[in-house]
Amino acid sequence: MNDELREAMGSAAVAAAKAVDYEGAGTVEFLLAEDGSFHFLEMNTRLQVEHPISECISGLDLVEQQIRVAAGLPLSFSQEDLTIRGHAIEARIYAEDPANGFLPATGPLAMFRPPEGPGIRLDTGVREGDEASIDFDPMLAKLVVHAADRPAAIRRMRRALQDFVLLGATTNIGFLVDVLSKDSFSAGETTTDFIEVNFPDGWHPGCLHSDEGEGMAMHAALAAGGAEHLGLHRRVSASATVDGEGGRGSPYNPFLSLRRNFP
């Protein structure tokens, strides 16, 4: 995304809203072709799930602005007032199983310890002790990072994901770490077939890179200790009978690799 493309997309989005006399918060989506042309996809008459990215790089509270407009008040800024600072990335944390076709997963959020630190933001409606169930959307949280540029934001997001301890329900955190580790992602080659191209055989926990090993081992130990404290280790026999990457012998399964700690 360069300044010229951003200006062109912004103008097209405004024109689309004006064409239907729309007033309020809205998000216009485009598909970007390799030749730099872009094509209208849809317009959502609301703030997009990824609106924290815009808030981070602009310093604006878009939810506040949405409420102001709905109340008949003017925006508190003009287009000329807007400046972009740094780069932001958002990762959706889902209760889902990337190794099983990204099917939704259920289970207790027995341990929910999000990362903290400069440039890290978490938007969530869950807390430790809640349950990921079939009654609600499987998205648990939105993890957002802000840094000076894209490479720094990628590094910050990887570290934040590695520091995210979530025990009880299967999540996509490991998959997200692997996505961020791909050279193609760093290069901005995030096409609509990114997963098929970069994970042609599907994703599994064994895809984790070696430089994550130490951090994953630390979290495995923490998870095992937390499981023992919460009594979850006594349930493992019912869920650890399947062979494969996520089953017996997996180096990323805290129950099995550290089972010597359990009675």
Residue ranges with predicted function:
Residues N2-L5, H51-E55:
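Alpha-helix N-cap/helix-initiation motif
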